[in-house]
């Protein structure tokens, strides 16, 4: 596997496709470029998903995230591009990408984008006393 930034996302078979479970990933070193100024924008990306048949491989996810370092785009566009690419690669039951961009001009920006597979609904929440 390469150690260079890459838009290629590798996947592997879900080891327990019969069960809904949540994967939570925190990516604290995301960087892209402001399309207006060319200055770097920094963010923490949170990826939460319920896999179906495929899971994303972590090293390829890291290299995928690195591939944005020289890409200029608005926060909203980047967040939705990440979601679209990950949904295309894994076809999850549910996926949410939350991008928390660090302060720029005195403003923090958080963008949340979600995907839900048609017909899928989470199990009811269980409350234990």
Swiss-Prot record:
Q: Per UniProt, where does substrate bind?
A: 56-58, 75-76
Taxonomically, which superkingdom? Bacteria
Q: Which InterPro entries match?
A: GTP-CH-I_C/QueF, NADPH_dep_7-cyano-7-deazaG_red, QueF, QueF_type1
Q: Which GO terms describe its cellular component?
A: cytoplasm
The reaction(s) this protein catalyses: 7-aminomethyl-7-carbaguanine + 2 NADP(+) = 7-cyano-7-deazaguanine + 2 NADPH + 3 H(+)
Note one Pfam family from the annotation. Answer: QueF
Its keywords, alphabetically, are: Cytoplasm, NADP, Oxidoreductase, Queuosine biosynthesis
- Report the protein's function: Catalyzes the NADPH-dependent reduction of 7-cyano-7-deazaguanine (preQ0) to 7-aminomethyl-7-deazaguanine (preQ1).
- Cite the NCBIfam families for this sequence: QueF-II
Please give the name of this protein. NADPH-dependent 7-cyano-7-deazaguanine reductase
Tell me the lineage of the source organism: Bacteria, Pseudomonadati, Pseudomonadota, Gammaproteobacteria, Chromatiales
Gene name of this polypeptide: queF
């Amino acid at each position: 596997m390469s150690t260079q930034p890459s838009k290629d996302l590798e996947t592997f078979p879900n080891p327990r496709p019969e069960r809904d479970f949540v994967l939570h990933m925190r990516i604290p070193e995301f960087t892209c470029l402001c399309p207006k100024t060319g200055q770097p924008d920094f963010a923490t990306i949170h990826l939460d998903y319920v896999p179906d048949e495929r899971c994303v491989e972590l090293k390829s996810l890291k290299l995928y995230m690195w591939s944005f370092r020289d890409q200029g785009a608005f926060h909203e566009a980047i967040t939705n591009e990440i979601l679209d690419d990950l949904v295309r690669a894994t076809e999850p039951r549910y996926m949410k990408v939350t991008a928390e961009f660090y302060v720029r001009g005195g403003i923090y920006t958080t963008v949340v984008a979600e995907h839900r597979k048609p017909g899928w609904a989470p199990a009811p929440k269980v409350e234990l006393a």
